């Protein structure tokens, strides 16, 4: 017989603000991919990615709600539940935002493709539900974020949330690199790929250490390790932010203008531009991470 005390079910997992938002996530998530599979349809890698995002987020949200409702998360000794849910909410926000942009861009049209307009209406409904799904995950991030004067998990802080965004942006960069980017053309651009890979790897280690609750078991202070790594990542990203555009958009090596005969979706110039943009975005994210961490340290010492 269970002697742990307290009710078997945690009603707050549903009736709290966060619980209600998660119920909406399950509703919109299930509705979105059900509409796609029923009539709206999808094709190619873009459509498959969108359906995967909606199904993955729906399944994992159900798992989180079930664990919190039945208090099963207390049995997961190897996981820091607060860090896990905060990191997942941020990741789901980014993934659903991407899907909410991609699906309407490639599959939704205001014109009917045939005499039957039902497919158009289904795809419009999918686009609306996908946008609402993104909003619900963004609201969860807002509700569970770290608040001044309250104890919180590291992944719920601005620094922790930025780590998830940095890793996600790196994945976008890897996707662009794999799509006709021609990064092997120069040794210098291969260095840029090494920068992206190294920073992504260390960022993932930081996230995993927090989710598994092993961040405090390091031989050196975790916060100091993160600050040192962030400074190194900024320096490395600065080099990539300079090198990549020079070797692909300077007239000596490449072209500053998009080739007129470049096919949409198969154009190396487009991939190179995407890498450039997201490299600068990640550089800004790492700088913001360092500024926030330093400001938090100064406030804590007062």
Swiss-Prot record:
GO-annotated cellular components: membrane
Keyword tags: Membrane, Repeat, Transmembrane, Transmembrane helix
Chief localisation class: membrane
Domain MARVEL: 13-149, 154-298
Transmembrane segments: 45-65, 87-107, 124-144, 158-178, 191-211, 225-245, 273-293
Signal peptide bounds: none
Membrane topology: Multi-pass membrane protein
Compartment annotation: Membrane
Family in the record: Belongs to the MAL family.
Protein name: Myeloid-associated differentiation marker-like protein 2
Species of provenance: Xenopus laevis
